[in-house]
From Swiss-Prot:
One CC-aspect GO term: cytosol
NCBIfam families in alphabetical order: PRK01827.1-3 (NF002497), PRK01827.1-5 (NF002499), thym_sym (TIGR03284)
Binding site for dUMP: R24, R129, R130, R169, S170, A171, D172, N180, H210, I211, Y212
Entry's family note: Belongs to the thymidylate synthase family. Bacterial-type ThyA subfamily.
Protein's name in the database: Thymidylate synthase
Quaternary structure and partners: Homodimer.
Record's catalysed reaction(s): dUMP + (6R)-5,10-methylene-5,6,7,8-tetrahydrofolate = 7,8-dihydrofolate + dTMP
Length: 266
């Protein structure tokens, strides 16, 4: 199996050519604007290998999004703490990703389940160009603990294969993006299984692609490592997209370098 270097090449590009910019957190970044990575999901599961990525957190976070949840309590019950820094004392985050995916509020007081709508369209009109899910609800941004970084995604069907493209307006390349790539690749596999399609491509499109100044040492260490071939994903069928459990997801042959710790910019 071929070794994929797209992500590492992007890290190097930003280190070498990025513009020094300030940011909301006050940390400082090196940044470029606009970049795309394409992953053929039949060639392996895109879980970055030049450092260990915590798969448990990725899977539980995606299941939490699909629950439509806005409280970190369920994540904490399963030993996942990646959202704790942004939660209030009651564990609430406001109307973040899962809320927008599953219950986008309308002016008449009802709610739209965007995920269910996309599933229905995939089954009845797979050539539609409207199979989009958005977390970027302008009217509710001020109530969110963190504005959506991975803002919206679109599905596309061709030759019996399902592809997904994500637009990530703000891309923390060292800490966040490896999670996001794997999460949406997993979602694409799940949706494909539920709609009797084969997984096609996952396409990651980044807007502000940045490396925080306090991650430069870690990125340099990571770039000194040779990538391994991607692992394989085994997904046990579930009755619906909303019935998958952690135990249904198995990643095999994940050969990786050691984890690299870095501070989160809050």
């Amino acid at each position: 199996m071929a070794t994929d270097r797209q992500y590492e090449d992007l890290l190097r590009l930003v280190l070498d050519t990025g513009t020094a910019k300030g940011d909301r957190t006050g940390t400082g970044t090196r940044s470029i604007f606009g970049h795309q990575l394409r992953y053929d999901l039949s060639a392996g599961f895109p879980l970055i290998t030049t450092k260990k990525v915590h798969l448990k957190s990725i899977v539980y976070e995606l299941l939490w999004f699909l629950r439509g949840d806005s409280n970190v309590g369920w994540l904490r019950e399963h030993g996942v703490t990646i959202w704790d820094e942004w939660a209030d004392p009651q564990g609430e985050l406001g109307p973040v990703y899962g809320v927008q995916w599953r219950s986008w509020p309308t002016p008449d007081g009802t709610h739209i389940d965007q995920i269910s709508q996309v599933l229905q369209t995939l089954r009845t009109d797979p050539d539609s160009r409207r199979m989009i899910v958005s977390a970027w609800n302008v009217a509710e941004l001020d109530r969110m603990a963190l504005a959506p970084c991975h803002a919206f995604f679109q599905f596309y069907v061709a030759d019996g294969k399902l592809s997904c493209q994500l637009y990530q307006r703000s891309a923390d390349l060292f800490l966040g993006v490896p999670f996001n790539i794997a999460s949406y690749a997993l979602l694409t596999h799940m949706v494909a299984q539920q709609t009797e399609l084969e997984p096609g491509e996952f396409i990651w499109t980044g807007g502000d692609c940045h490396i925080y100044d306090n991650h430069v040492e870690q990125v340099t260490e990571q770039l000194g490592r040779e990538p391994y071939p991607f692992p394989r994903l085994e997904l046990r069928p579930a009755p619906s997209l909303f019935d998958y459990r952690f135990e249904d997801v198995t990643v095999t042959d994940y050969r990786h370098h050691p984890a690299i710790k870095a501070p989160v910019a809050v």
